[in-house]
Every structure is written in structure tokens, then in C-alpha cells.
Amino acid sequence: MTKNINQPVAYPIFTFRWLAIHGLAIPTVFFLGGITAMQFIQR
């Protein structure tokens, strides 16, 4: 893994890992943002 740094063809990271991280991170950020917003709106 030391000499294959300059070869982006070996590991296309932006296929599964990008969809997995953004597919789970965006709903969780929206969910936590909704909870914190509701706590300020009620009172």
C-alpha cells in the first residue's frame, strides 16, 4: 500500500463508501437537527 498511492484505479472509493457514508450521515444530521430544533420551538 506504499507504492499504490498514485493509482486511483485500484480502489475506487467514491462508489460504495461514498454512498454508504452520505446515505447514512445526511439522514442522521437531519434527524438530530430536527430534534434540537423541536426542543427550542416548544418553549
UniProtKB/Swiss-Prot annotation:
One of its GO terms (cellular component) is photosystem II reaction center. The chain crosses the membrane at residues 18-34. Keywords: Chloroplast, Electron transport, Heme, Iron, Membrane, Metal-binding, Photosynthesis, Photosystem II, Plastid, Thylakoid, Transmembrane, Transmembrane helix, Transport. It is found in: Plastid, Chloroplast thylakoid membrane. It comes from the Eukaryota. InterPro entries: PSII_cyt_b559_bsu (IPR006241), PSII_cyt_b559_CS (IPR006216), PSII_cyt_b559_N (IPR013081). With its partner (PsbE) binds heme. PSII binds additional chlorophylls, carotenoids and specific lipids. It is a single-pass membrane protein. This b-type cytochrome is tightly associated with the reaction center of photosystem II (PSII). PSII is a light-driven water:plastoquinone oxidoreductase that uses light energy to abstract electrons from H(2)O, generating O(2) and a proton gradient subsequently used for ATP formation. It consists of a core antenna complex that captures photons, and an electron transfer chain that converts photonic excitation into a charge separation. This is Cytochrome b559 subunit beta.
